[in-house]
Amino acid sequence: MSYIDNPWRGSGLAHPDLDPIPWPSADAAAPRSIMSQTFDPAPTPWVSHDGLAHTVGVDQLWIKDERNRMGLGSFKALGAAYVIACDAAKGDAKGQGYVTASAGNHGLSVAAGAQAFGARAVVYLADTVPEAFADRLRAKGAEVRREGAVYEDSMAAAAAAASAEGLRLLSDSSWSGYSARPHRLMEGYCMLMAE
C-alpha cells in the first residue's frame, strides 16, 4: 500500500504540539496479521449503490460495507480492537482495563477488543446517547458509565477515570501528549483500505 504525501501537511500550522505527530502508517500487513489471529480476516464486501451514484452525478458508486466485520454492525470495528490486539501480542492486554468515551461505533471496537483478549472495557457515554446503544456495548461485555450532556464531557470523564483507576485510555482522538494510541488505532484501518 502507498499513500500520497499531502504537500500542505503542517503548513500554516506553526504550533509545537504538532511536531511529534507521526506520519500515517501505510502498513496493511501488520493489522491483517495481528487481527486474523483472533477475528475473521475475511474482507468485507463492496456494494454498488446506483441510486446514490445517480444522485451525486457519477456513473458508479461503490460502498465498503463494514456492518458485519467482527459482528459489530459498525464502521469502526478495526481501530480500537487493533490497538488492544497489539497490546495482547506483547502480552499486555489480559486483565488490563481500557477506558474510552464514545458517541457510537468506537466504543463497540473497544468492547470487542477487550472481550476477545480478556481485558475490561469501560465506555463513557454522554446522556444524549440512546440507551439502545448502551445495551449493545453491555452485550459485548463493556461497563457503561454516563457522564455529561455532550461527548466532550464523557471524554473528560474517561481521561479522569484512566488516571484515577489505572485504566488505559483508548481514545480515537488525539491531542498534545496523546497521539501514540490514536496513531496505532488509525493503522488498524489500513486493513480496510487494503481490501
What are these regions (language model features)?
Residues 1-195:
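PLP-dependent amino-acid enzyme catalytic core
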